[in-house]
């Protein structure tokens, strides 16, 4: 009941083609196999226990992410709740991953130019799209509360309807439904939600985000909106509609709407001049890299992030506050002082007079 309704609403804005595309399916399988076999022998060996035949398909192993948290909003906090990852048996990932790539190809095939999905794309593509989209004045961002935990039975109904519409094998759809409704671990059974580690995590999160946007806002068709997982930013103020208010109240997914004249997306600030990274964050990461004697391994990545603001020249002064400019100048000083460590072509940007 809910699946076909949600699919219909999605197709109104993104008219997916239901016909099976043999070439796309072959490409999806090849891309998946190539990515898996490109991993180092050490990585494959470390993950060999995930190929154990005694590991049940509907059982996951729960791990806690141990990486440094570098989000801007989490600076100077004493502690933050750990993010969990659920690992699946290799056969489960190999079963679903090629078809998820196929769905992504079908989505990109018909995606209107007014929408942008930041998946498999470089920063130059994002920068070009943002400049074309003219992010000026009041823009709209959606910040979701507990996004992964809110991917409940209604979203699964949409995913199943989508897979049937695209003609995916029925046994695959039944397998997906079984795992979503029966998944457990040593801790016990899980509620229906999204888990980091699923083959479909980013794709289906992005599509759920798009679906919520289509249901929640009055769209005229000329808005430019970018999506990536639970991130969304539109180049104008979007107004809420109440057409589907009854259904939206059923969803666990709740959005905190922010209308701002300083829009951001995936950690990048957006403007009509292009994208640039919040400099305080980059400077603090550079300081951490210096403290941990890891600067040589990551300075190229930070230099690339800073380069988008650096290439704007004097125009960046109109975009940044005094605090941001100070952090930006500090970033540039650190990079130029250590530019002998740069190994990529980005070095030439900082050597130009």
UniProtKB/Swiss-Prot annotation:
EC code: 2.7.7.48, 3.6.4.13
KW Kinase (keyword) present: no
Taxonomic classification: Viruses, Riboviria, Orthornavirae, Kitrinoviricota, Alsuviricetes
Annotated GO biological process: DNA-templated transcription; viral RNA genome replication
UniProt record similarity statement: Belongs to the potexviruses/carlaviruses RNA replication protein family.
Keywords, alphabetical: ATP-binding, Helicase, Hydrolase, Multifunctional enzyme, Nucleotide-binding, Nucleotidyltransferase, RNA-directed RNA polymerase, Transferase, Viral RNA replication
Pfam families, per the entry: RdRP_2
Reaction(s) the record says it catalyses: RNA(n) + a ribonucleoside 5'-triphosphate = RNA(n+1) + diphosphate; ATP + H2O = ADP + phosphate + H(+)
Identification of the protein by name: RNA replication protein
Function: RNA replication. The central part of this protein possibly functions as an ATP-binding helicase.
CDD domains: Betaflexiviridae_RdRp
Domain RdRp catalytic as annotated: residue spans: 137-244
GO molecular function, one term: ATP hydrolysis activity
């Amino acid at each position: 009941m809910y699946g076909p309704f949600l699919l219909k609403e999605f197709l109104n804005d993104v008219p997916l083609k239901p016909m099976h595309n043999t070439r796309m399916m072959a490409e999806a399988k090849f891309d998946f196999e190539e990515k898996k076999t490109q991993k180092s022998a050490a990585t494959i060996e470390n993950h060999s226990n995930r190929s154990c035949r005694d590991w049940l398909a509907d059982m996951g192993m729960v791990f806690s992410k141990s990486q440094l948290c570098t989000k801007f909003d989490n600076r100077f906090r004493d502690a933050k709740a750990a993010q969990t990852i659920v690992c699946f048996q290799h056969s489960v990932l190999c079963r679903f991953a090629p078809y998820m790539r196929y769905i992504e190809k079908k989505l990109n095939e018909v995606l209107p130019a007014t929408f942008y999905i930041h998946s498999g794309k470089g920063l130059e593509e994002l920068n070009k799209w943002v400049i074309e989209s003219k992010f000026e004045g009041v823009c709209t961002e959606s910040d979701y509360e507990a996004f992964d935990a809110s991917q409940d039975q209604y979203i699964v109904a949409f995913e199943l309807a989508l897979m049937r519409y695209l003609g995916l094998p029925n046994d695959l759809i039944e397998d997906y439904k079984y795992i979503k409704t029966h998944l457990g671990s040593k801790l016990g059974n899980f509620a229906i939600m999204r888990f980091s580690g699923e083959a479909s995590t980013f794709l289906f999160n992005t599509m759920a985000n798009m679906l919520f946007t289509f249901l929640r806002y009055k769209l005229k068709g000329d808005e430019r909106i970018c999506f990536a997982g639970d991130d969304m930013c539109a180049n104008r103020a979007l107004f809420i509609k109440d057409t589907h208010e009854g259904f939206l109240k059923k969803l666990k997914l709740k959005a905190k709407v922010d209308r701002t004249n300083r829009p951001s997306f995936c950690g990048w600030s957006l403007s009509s001049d292009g994208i640039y990274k919040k400099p305080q964050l980059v400077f603090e990461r550079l300081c951490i890299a210096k403290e941990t004697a890891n600067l040589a391994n990551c300075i190229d990545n930070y230099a690339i992030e800073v380069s988008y603001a650096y290439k704007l020249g004097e125009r960046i002064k109109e975009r940044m506050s005094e605090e941001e400019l100070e952090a930006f100048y500090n970033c540039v000083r650190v990079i130029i002082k250590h530019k002998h460590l740069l190994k990529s072509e980005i070095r030439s940007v900082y050597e130009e007079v």
